[in-house]
């Protein structure tokens, strides 16, 4: 397996959003945070399936494949993001299935058709959803879908929503096993940004679907 610093550099070399849209809260995750999350999650997704909901330019999906996911699927509603993601995967010679579609249309039938003989593998959702700053409750749409299709979920959220997410997931029948705090680096890309760079405190949750038992002790 490659070193985390090497993965960080590889991901940071990839194309960012070519035309980020504020209403979709499109922020490209920096290489360090992406690498940290992927190394945190690798025991879950190694030789299994990764589904990146709202994949943007594909950093999490591509990184997971580099670290040994058997299959990686990226879903995004924005066609420009998907085209950039495909370019990024090609640049690193990584095989990822990218689809331009609404995440609400992703279901077991779709995934079974995409995965074929790999349909019975563990499905790990790794997502960087919108925080809901531009569209209220946008984060809930992603949480609901992740809990529907994923066996294990890694999801990034704005730190002030930590208590809400914990209660929301538990009410939906999910089990939060690990919480990881970090900073999300955001450069000035929209007109309403006043500073060149800000670091937003975020929290990453590892969630198990009710009835799914992990088969290893997380370190």
Curated annotation (Swiss-Prot):
Gene3D superfamilies: Vaccinia Virus protein VP39 (3.40.50.150). One of its GO terms (molecular function) is transferase activity. Disulfide bonds: none annotated. GO terms for biological process: biosynthetic process. InterPro entries: rRNA_MeTrfase/Polyamine_Synth (IPR051720), SAM-dependent_MTases_sf (IPR029063). It holds the Pfam family PrmA. This is Uncharacterized protein MJ0284. It comes from Methanocaldococcus jannaschii (strain ATCC 43067 / DSM 2661 / JAL-1 / JCM 10045 / NBRC 100440) (Methanococcus jannaschii).
């Amino acid at each position: 397996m490659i070193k985390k610093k090497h993965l960080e550099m590889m991901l940071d070399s990839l194309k960012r959003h070519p035309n980020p849209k504020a209403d979709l809260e499109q922020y490209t995750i920096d290489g360090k945070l992406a690498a940290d999350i992927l190394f945190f999650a690798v025991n879950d997704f190694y030789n299994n399936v990764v589904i990146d909901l709202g994949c943007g330019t594909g950093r999490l999906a591509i990184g997971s494949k580099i670290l040994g996911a058997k299959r990686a699927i990226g879903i995004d509603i924005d066609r420009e993001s998907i085209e950039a993601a495909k370019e990024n995967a090609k640049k690193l010679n990584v095989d990822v299935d990218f689809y331009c579609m609404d995440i609400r249309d992703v279901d077991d039938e779709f995934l079974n058709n995409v995965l074929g003989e790999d349909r019975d593998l563990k499905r790990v959702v790794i997502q960087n959803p919108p925080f809901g700053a531009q569209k209220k409750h946008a984060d809930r749409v992603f949480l609901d879908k992740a809990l529907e299709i994923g066996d294990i979920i890694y999801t990034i959220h704005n730190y002030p929503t930590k208590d809400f997410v914990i209660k929301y997931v538990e009410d939906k029948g999910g089990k939060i096993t690990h919480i990881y705090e970090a900073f999300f680096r955001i450069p000035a890309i929209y007109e309403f940004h006043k500073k060149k760079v800000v670091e937003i405190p975020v929290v990453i949750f590892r969630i198990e679907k009710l009835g799914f038992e992990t088969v290893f002790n997380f370190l």
